[in-house]
Amino acid sequence: MHLPGCAPAMADGSFSLAGHLLRSPGGSTSRLHSIEAILGFTKDDGILGTFPAERGARGAKERDRRLGARPACPKAPEEGSEPSPPPAPAPAPEYEAPRPYCPKEPGEARPSPGLPVGPATGEAKLSEEEQPKKKHRRNRTTFTTYQLHELERAFEKSHYPDVYSREELAGKVNLPEVRVQVWFQNRRAKWRRQEKLEVSSMKLQDSPLLSFSRSPPSATLSPLGAGPGSGGGPAGGALPLESWLGPPLPGGGATALQSLPGFGPPAQSLPASYTPPPPPPPFLNSPPLGPGLQPLAPPPPSYPCGPGFGDKFPLDEADPRNSSIAALRLKAKEHIQAIGKPWQAL
């Protein structure tokens, strides 16, 4: 952008107020619109005289430097002529251009804090973040016998001691309060495991399968042909009998008894060398059942036993838990022998 009237002033190589004046359309010079007038400079200021000379000298020097640094285009050598010597190196410029920073090591810091971070430093930071952090492993505490004894005594008093009790106990056993707290947590977990094991073992002992195996099985009496349980044998009403071992129906007792598994006539079920036992006491004899007679009622809870019978069959042996299988077989055979004769008479 050129202002009118500035060309003569630039040719003289100096700035003058007349060259930069913007005159009004009327031709009056009352108002000045030059840069020097706006900034408040006048002709008497020294800066106006020195600025154009310095600017011209600097521009000429820059032009000389650019012309000297530009290499000349080499000409193609003619045939048969010797190669021309290499051109002389260009003179070094007065200042060097800034070069990019190249760190020797990836973790080397940049000397200038104002410059941006290079890619090598960023890669080093990423590699450090990718490395897994080492897991902090706490050393295991080894307790002495005295410490364990005192801790167990405190655990018997209270499973959940407060912070004051823990601090007092920690000072007594020479341990940190945190270690005492962790010990109580582990001890409570161990105590809960022991309680669960005890409860599970008690449930297994009280299960019906184990209680059934302890009591004598009632199925062992079936092949022995145990008779009706109303009259009672030597064991009386203490032995629990099955429902099919009840008193026979009138008129069909022998048939129902022979239809049971493992039961037959006394002569066939017993060997020939078997000697019948002595007759049972009088109160054990059951009257023959006629067609019009009803089955006997259950016996009374107690019987007047003689001294000989009490010595032979004590009350302790009547308990099925104390009696053995051999004793039960012998009692069943005696009972069959006792009630077999009246049924044969029918």
Curated annotation (Swiss-Prot):
Residues 83-92, 274-304 have a biased composition (Pro residues). Its main location: nucleus. It comes from the Eukaryota. One of its GO terms (cellular component) is nucleus. Residues 207-225, 237-246 have a biased composition (Low complexity). Changing R188Q: In MCOPS16; uncertain significance. The keyword Transmembrane helix does not apply. Residues 136-195 bind DNA. Plays a critical role in eye formation by regulating the initial specification of retinal cells and/or their subsequent proliferation. Binds to the photoreceptor conserved element-I (PCE-1/Ret 1) in the photoreceptor cell-specific arrestin promoter. This is Retinal homeobox protein Rx. It comes from Homo sapiens.
